[in-house]
Amino acid sequence: WLKAFPEAKIPQTEADIKSKNRTPTVLYNGMLHPLIGMTMKGVIWYQGEDNWNRAHTYADMFTRLINGWRAEWKQGDFPFYYCQIAPYDYGIITEKGKEVINSAYLREAQAKVEHRVANSGMAVLLDAGMEKGIHPAKKQVAGERLALLALTKTYGVEGVNGESPYYKSIEIKNDTVVVSFERANMWISGKNCFESKNFQVAGEDKVFYPAKAWIERSNCLLYTSDAADE
């Protein structure tokens, strides 16, 4: 399936190999293919950093990877749970502009896969990264959230919230933006409202300012900022 992605080139000679462990097909043939045929309950996948600048092809490539593994095993659509790439300042390792190195584009592509591929799920790690550390230390957080996905979606454990809220829509009312989410019933209490300081808002000038935010009802975030332009 790599033929559909010309940038994933397989070196023709050993001299063309810059990094052997990153050569397309090497990890698959060396570590995965020998396991084909064994009983498969499901997969948990920790996304590495090497794809941070491939957001434009990531959703298609990752979808094909999952479908390809399932086809090889011939054991149906077994669960495939994966980690969102954690935040990191990629400006440390490249001189490209923020429009290119913004890993938010990759996280957006990862979110698309969850909605394209049946029986899959993404563990959100937006709060578990390190600005100056490309390998974040909070691996336990990743493990716990993958486990919650499995408990919720595979083992049917009740009372466990394994899925993160997913953006649905926005509505602008004067100086207030109402952001609605799917899958937020267990994330937000319908009985109480509470304030959050984890949001920013920007106007057409794309300059972000801290926003006053409230979690309200079962699936909405309301936030405002006096500093942002319309």
Model-flagged regions — what are they?
Residues 153-193:
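Surface beta-strand/loop "capping" patches
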Residues 218-221:
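Aromatic sugar-binding surface patches on proteins
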Residues 189-209:
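Short, surface-exposed alpha-helix to beta-strand junction/turn motifs within ectodomains of secreted
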Residues 209-211, 225:
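Immunoglobulin-like IPT/TIG beta-sandwich domains and homologous Ig-like subdomains
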